[in-house]
UniProtKB/Swiss-Prot annotation:
The gene is cct-1. Its main location: cytoplasm. GO terms for cellular component: chaperonin-containing T-complex; nucleus. Keywords: ATP-binding, Chaperone, Cytoplasm, Nucleotide-binding. PROSITE patterns: TCP1_1, TCP1_2, TCP1_3. This is T-complex protein 1 subunit alpha.
Amino acid sequence: MASAGDSILALTGKRTTGQGIRSQNVTAAVAIANIVKSSLGPVGLDKMLVDDVGDVIVTNDGATILKQLEVEHPAGKVLVELAQLQDEEVGDGTTSVVIVAAELLKRADELVKQKVHPTTIINGYRLACKEAVKYISENISFTSDSIGRQSVVNAAKTSMSSKIIGPDADFFGELVVDAAEAVRVENNGKVTYPINAVNVLKAHGKSARESVLVKGYALNCTVASQAMPLRVQNAKIACLDFSLMKAKMHLGISVVVEDPAKLEAIRREEFDITKRRIDKILKAGANVVLTTGGIDDLCLKQFVESGAMAVRRCKKSDLKRIAKATGATLTVSLATLEGDEAFDASLLGHADEIVQERISDDELILIKGPKSRTASSIILRGANDVMLDEMERSVHDSLCVVRRVLESKKLVAGGGAVETSLSLFLETYAQTLSSREQLAVAEFASALLIIPKVLASNAARDSTDLVTKLRAYHSKAQLIPQLQHLKWAGLDLEEGTIRDNKEAGILEPALSKVKSLKFATEAAITILRIDDLIKLDKQEPLGGDDCHA
């Protein structure tokens, strides 16, 4: 039987087993959580991250902070990946999911020290998570239809409250909801809101409140030549992922020419190859050509003569979205299976109008009325790159929240209301269990209170006092049927009191809380199951002389 502690293995590595590795993992997880803890909530503080090149990021987005950290400890990496997963799945709640996971681990470690087996704790945590999710959907969530559009705006504002655009949440809340509703898609009776169709552009200057929402897809490019039309009605769009520069022979190919006069023919052929490609695209009916590569100045004349609009050096990510919105196919090559080159009209996308407009101080290409899917664009204004980047992250998080609310239509009250309600419910539920899992469920219940505690302490309030009051409110709501309305009670961090957060409009998607609980529990269980760490030493490369031994 392996003893706890370190032992040297025969395969030149270090082994840590038993309680030693468990404590190490918990320490690493708590260290990660402590980094982001002070950034939670509407009055959370920002972090300044400077990378090895000297680039600066100022943010309080949990996923962004952890992404920039080079975490070496394996247990720490699990929490970093957890924040990324929450960011991808929900978009918001990345900080709280890490804090809850670390708290669950800390409490599980205490139970293990009291000789409770990890398997018992894992079963208890799974049971607690299952009951908590059930309780959220049955008792403390409500539909957005009961309040209407304002509930969606409030959820967006709650998401923004902790961000740089928090002071302008009223303005940005409406902006984000309008942007999400503009990309609504109905397919076989199912309504979805693909927020990837919302393009977010950043422009220096003016104030944040002068950001604008543009109907249509905005492309941060201009036409390749001023002689081209700046407006094209009934646009047929070719999306190309190759360059329309003069064709050059590949390196390593040499042509022996004895007659100098033939050099000109080779040069002309290099130009004619591209010319023929452009002819094929224009003959297919294209009157707008967007390409990720360059367009040779000699070729621009063809586009001007045919009255087509050409835009070069577009981002590939933009072209993919435009292709999806207009029904075009992003073409990588004109080569056919027969070895010829051809361009079919079926590869073209369609839009009502494409126009180059001046918005704020920049010229942009706007694609209006795309045929396959609607699109919208948000142009953010701000003082500098650091501010604009953080605004973009904030808007992305809010868009994700709005999508979740519009698709699931389920909301919960914010400000620690859900966590406190769940904590009291699970405490009562734990007392109904006669097995050892009771201890784990009770610890799970206590761990959830970390969220209201951190929210209060970040706002420079007395967390013990506020959380005690909050527990009293929720206890009454669960025990006295006439006081059920108290289940919406949450923290008011500005006044340092308790209030009805449903009335106050502090709302979050129920899905965000459910996924957050599930992810945090699974991450804690993953780390808790580890009882042995074997770290192999780096193998020394064999010396030059050893090969000839």
